[in-house]
């Protein structure tokens, strides 16, 4: 009887360790997958080497959105412009942030973006706030969504724990991410000029 108990305990421990090894990755909050915002199929194939060291924050400089429906439409508009007008393989950003407090999946954690030029695209994740932030500030829920996304990236192993945030204007001659948003990201603990 004792031998059977030992075998049973050993089998249960083995099963528990298998379950722990197969546990799902950490939850990443409100990331709207491409299919939910009705993205066009991506033709992009070039992968990022993970974990990535840099995050480049930009703004789309267009209309802002503050509901899931309007933000899904805005994500479609940005993607359509990038694909149809610029000839890119997909929306240029890895993620888009809406004023609704949701993150919209662009190219995601694994595919190289087209957001910051040939030097920075292969070594960074591009996060773009949907709207123009020259004279206005994104609402707190949008800023929280961005911060949560960055924590998610670290938890998933997509971003280094010592990642660096840069404004689009830090790596390219542009006004992006807008004066007001730029002031905010400069206060983030991972920001480096």
Curated annotation (Swiss-Prot):
The keyword Signal applies. Coiled coil: none annotated. Keywords: Antibiotic, Antimicrobial, Disulfide bond, Immunity, Innate immunity, Secreted, Signal. One of its GO terms (biological process) is detection of bacterium. InterPro entries: Amidase/PGRP_sf (IPR036505), Amidase_domain (IPR002502), Peptidoglycan_recognition (IPR017331), PGRP (IPR015510), PGRP_domain_met/bac (IPR006619). Gene3D superfamilies: Peptidoglycan recognition protein-like (3.40.80.10). It is found in: Secreted; Cytoplasmic granule. Residues 1-21 form the signal peptide. Residues 50-178 form the N-acetylmuramoyl-L-alanine amidase domain. GO terms for molecular function: N-acetylmuramoyl-L-alanine amidase activity; peptidoglycan binding; peptidoglycan immune receptor activity; zinc ion binding. Disulfide bonds join 28-152, 44-89, 65-71. Innate immunity protein that plays several important functions in antimicrobial and antitumor defense systems. Acts as a pattern receptor that binds to murein peptidoglycans (PGN) of Gram-positive bacteria and thus provides bactericidal activity. Forms an equimolar complex with heat shock protein HSPA1A and induces programmed cell death through apoptosis and necroptosis in tumor cell lines by activating the TNFR1 receptor on the target cell membrane. In addition, acts in complex with the Ca(2+)-binding protein S100A4 as a chemoattractant able to induce lymphocyte movement. Belongs to the N-acetylmuramoyl-L-alanine amidase 2 family. Homotetramer. This is Peptidoglycan recognition protein 1.
